[in-house]
Structure formats: structure tokens, C-alpha cells
Amino acid sequence: YIELRSMDTCGWDCLCSGPAFNVGMLYGNLDEVYELISKWDKNKIINAYLEAPKKGFNTQLMGKDLLYWASYLLDLSKKGLEKRDLLNKSKKNETLFLNHLQKVIDNKKTNADHMISKFSKNEDLNELYDK
């Protein structure tokens, strides 16, 4: 049993990127993923989980920051979607649904970083609700 949950509090492109990421991982090289994470220490994973809300992409896990791991895992997911090779009417594969995640990684800013930046401008909570 695996529970896959969608991301929330984000736009359409973000909502589609979560399931696409999961599908890409499942259709990708599961042995490569297993080889990678089987070496991870449980306590370090828990620590990263607890630190991530405070430190974001700067959180360390197994000697690398979460930005590194996000990029690495996104590349694995892309390979899985390319391997799956399911095309839309425009002959584009499902990797297009990962564009939002790629932008997050390229900009090195999470949705939380953007919200903090908006709030920090004038400390007005209404800024957080404007889209």
C-alpha cells in the first residue's frame, strides 16, 4: 500500500506536477532509486523532514542540500516519463507537467519562499492571498 497525495495550495501547473513526478518515478529505474535511498539513514531523513520547514532547500540530507536531491530526483522522474512515452495531441510527452517543479528548482525558491517575500515587503497578510 502506497499513499500518494497531491500538493495543495498551488496553481494548476503545480497540481499536475505532483502526480506526473510520481508516475515518472514509478515508470523510471526503480532499482536506481532503491540503490540511492537504501543507503540513507532513517534518523537523518527524520531530521531533514523536521528542518525543511525552517531551512527549505538549504536543509541537509546525506551530505547534500535538498535542492540537489530535488534536482536529482526530478531528473529520474523525467527519464521515467520519457521511457513511458505517452504523448498528447501535440506529440509532447508528460515531462511538460514537470515544468513547474523545474522552475522551482531553477529559481531555487519554494512557494513558501515566495510567500515570505510577499509578506516581508510590508508585513501585510493580504499580500499572501492576492494571486
Where do the protein language model's features map onto the residues?
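C-terminal accessory/tail domains of diverse enzymes
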Residues: 1-131
